[in-house]
Amino acid sequence: MEKFKSLSKDAVDVTEGRILEKWKNEDILNKCIENRENAPYFVFYDGPATANGHPGLHHMVAKFLKDTICKYKTMQGYKVLRKVGWDTHGLPVELQVEKELGFSGKKDIEKYGIKEFNQKCRESVWKNESTFTDLTEKMGQFIDIKHPYVTYDNNYIE
């Protein structure tokens, strides 16, 4: 005796698409915020991922746990402001760009040009942004992905 109807991948994809479209069309995230006009605030900054690499399972598990906290606080009546961030600098980024360019150290960077190298690093951190964004939406994380904080942005640094 089958307790649950088995669904094909196509059926799951169609259902997922309908739900995501409904959430988007009805602007569910903003409704969760606007419906709590005088409620106490709970502000959540999603610890930044570096989008120069592919998202891993650890990213998705962390996003799920963070989203669970935000949704729980929403159910408790808080006005939950959520903002995603991007880690756009640091040694891992520089090492990856050095590897891509075939460099073996500081002298190669100086020969290439520090300004040019920094620009290459800035470009590299956005390689997989769309993959991260797509996965964030598909997993149903309610978070502001349109206005992220970016760690190389002067507004963030100040």
Predicted features and spans:
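N-terminal, positively charged nucleic-acid-binding surface of large information/translation enzymes
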Residues: 1-158
